[in-house]
Structure formats: C-alpha cells, structure tokens
Amino acid sequence: MANGRGKTLVIHSVKLPVMDGVAEYGQMGLGPEGAYRNREFAGEAIRSEIRELWKEDVVFDPQTSGGLLLAVPSDEADQLAAELGKMDISGGIIGTVTELQDKYVIFD
C-alpha cells in the first residue's frame, strides 16, 4: 500500500486492538512460527519502535482473526468509524499515512 505510492504508514501500536489473553501468552513467548517468517519477509521496509517484544510479535502474527486495514482520507476516518460502530463492526483509527520517511511502515 505504501511502497507503490512513496508513502509511509505510521501505525500507533498502543491503538492496535488485541484479544484477551494475547499479552499474557505473548509474554510467555508463545506465538506462531509464521510471525517470524513475516518479520523476516518485511525486513528492511519496516521500523519498529515498539518496546514490548510480545506486541511486536503480534504485529507480525499471520492470524488476524478477520482483521482488515483500510486507508481512507483523514477527513473521512471518524465518519467511517462511526458508521462501522452503528453496524456493530469494531473499528478505529490506528495510524496515519505520511510522506515517505526512512521506511514504508513504522510502528511507534
């Protein structure tokens, strides 16, 4: 999404929703093998400033539990989140798109 447009996605890790129990299991070092392959694949395109190792593992977890990332114009984001809420669909603003920085994706 960012690579082809010369942009950077800045994802705010504190805004990422996680299921109950994920932090506890992650702190025990339990996670899928695919997360490590995803991290390796993304490699040089990503910079992580996440301080908790378990949360960094979560962002690379291949099991999204139906998760979906949408990029919408910033002036429409709040309205979209409200409309999703009316339909009992969980949604929220977890980041922004900026001009290209040193990486295509930054987790802060």
Where are these regions (language model features)?
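Glycine-/charge-enriched secondary-structure boundary and capping motifs
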Residues: 1-108
